[in-house]
Amino acid sequence: MEFSSFLFTILLFSLNISPLVSAHGSNHEDFLKCLSYRMNDNTVEPKVIHTSKDSSFFSILDSSIQNPRFSVSETPKPVSIITPVKASDVQTVIRCAQLHGIHVRTRSAGHCYEGLSYIAYNKPFAVIDLRNLRSISLDVDNRTGWVQTGATAGELYYEIGKTTKSLAFPAGIHPTVGVGGQFSGGGYGTLLRKYGLAADNIIDALVVDASGRILDRQAMGEDYFWAIRGGGGSSFGVILSWKVKLVDVPSTITVFKVQKTSKKEAVRIIKKWQYAADKVPDDLFIRTTLERSNKNAVHALFTGLYIGPVNNLLALMEEKFPELGLEKEGCEEMSWIESVLWFADFPKGESLGVLTNRERTSLSFKGKDDFVQEPIPEAAIQEIWRRLEAPEARLGKIILTPFGGKMSEMAEYETPFPHRGGNLYEIQYVAYWREEEDKNKTETDKYLKWVDSVYEFMTPYVSKSPRGAYVNFKDMDLGMYLGKKKTKYEEGKSWGVKYFKNNFERLVRVKTRVDPTDFFCDEQSIPLVNKVT
């Protein structure tokens, strides 16, 4: 099929499409026939192809929607869900979708802030749910491992923890987050100051490209490999697995929590934290969270991890950050894998097996983030505190994550994630609420407006030209493709430079080369060079 004919087919079926599963007509039926013929699905166990006619369809769809805000009847639904059991199944989906004009979303564990791993607007789409592709193979002697992208961070941590006490991997704090999206956008946790992002520690990958080929690092080339490690993998293909580099950790890790309920004291300590947290030795990570307690009063929580014993930590804190008042009684020594459980708020003594649980969150949320490059004034911290006292911030959080260390050592261009040296910390504003308590969406609007108001208030105090954002905290308020500008590139640049700064242009060039028909696209994907919207 010639490109012009193929493009016309895609455009034709992207117009006037209802979000209902039953309304997509013959091209969906042809897509399913293509899948069934190539996969011989009737003889495959477990079942791979799921449609709305199947009893499994909605349970599979809902099981990995990690933001209940999008688990409502109004949300567009896929025409089908495919749960591959082998790599060739993914190749088949891509080839059949290309042939029959079906858009594809790829879901690892469903934690996209805006639901774009299982939602598409105004076009028929299928979801590739990678839940069955979750094997993990570690090579402790060579400090490496292969991780399929249907696995979660918790499953990776579990395999590491049961295999070795001297190795770790620097990814996110929340164990239920999938490694597919997290690693392809960056991925950070308690080890980021020592070892950088998850993406910084990926040394190979297997990807299904727009032609349905399976490529490793050597076959895809260094530009392609660069793009998927921080540029958001969904713009470039379906990532099947990562080869990760494991990092060294000692037998003893120290963790601590210090809570401050006095506004005056907390504000004073946060002000000092801004000058210390990115400059202390990279063995130390101190995150600050502002939130409401059970008694509904705002408090500041300083949560830390030190790569080493408690006595060394206390000496360091006395020298670098005495204002926190850390005492030995507030610290606990443990192994790295135990610290993973501790940061995930599991009860003490819980078995490692809980890291493999895939429980779905019960709270809807909306989040935004910024990067802070100069300490914000005390008056601004006080105003943030005041805004957390609002009724709609009852379950809200403002999270300050320190950078520095390894994050400052790497250049902006080494991976697509550009927010490196010069950033003191990242600050995230998140509102949570219970969707079932707000049937008419009136309260939801209040929560969304609260996040917007905090974000607007912070404008003078955060990065500028561009105002940076983290692609893993995807925010549709930054913009989406609406066809209001001459080219998709012009639209995409408005938020692309916020996520990627100068790396956006290189990502566009890679995208144009490896996916010239823009098959792998969503409302905020990397555009082609001068593609007409």
Swiss-Prot record:
Where are the annotated glycans? Answer: N142, N440
Q: Note whether Nuclease occurs among the keywords.
A: no
Instruction: Give the FAD-binding PCMH-type domain ranges.
Output: 74-249
One Gene Ontology term, aspect cellular component: extracellular region
| PROSITE patterns listed in its UniProt record | FAD_PCMH
Q: Which Pfam families match?
A: BBE, FAD_binding_4
Give the Pros-8alpha-FAD histidine positions (modified residues).
H111
Say which enzyme class the record assigns: oxidoreductase
Provide the GO biological process annotations. response to salt stress
Localization terms from the record: Secreted, Cell wall
The entry's keywords: Cell wall, Disulfide bond, FAD, Flavoprotein, Glycoprotein, Nucleotide-binding, Oxidoreductase, Secreted, Signal
Q: What happens when the gene is disrupted?
A: No obvious developmental defects but reduced biomass and reduced leaves number. Increased sensitivity to salt stress.
The intrachain disulfides are C34-C96
For this UniProt entry, the molecular function terms from Gene Ontology, in alphabetical order, are: FAD binding; oxidoreductase activity
Give the signal sequence positions.
Answer: 1-23
EC number(s) recorded for this UniProt protein: 1.1.1.-
* Similarity section: Belongs to the oxygen-dependent FAD-linked oxidoreductase family.
Protein function: Involved in adaptation to salt stress.
In its UniProt entry, what is this protein called?
A: Berberine bridge enzyme-like 28
Organism annotation: Arabidopsis thaliana
The lineage is:
Eukaryota, Viridiplantae, Streptophyta, Embryophyta, Tracheophyta
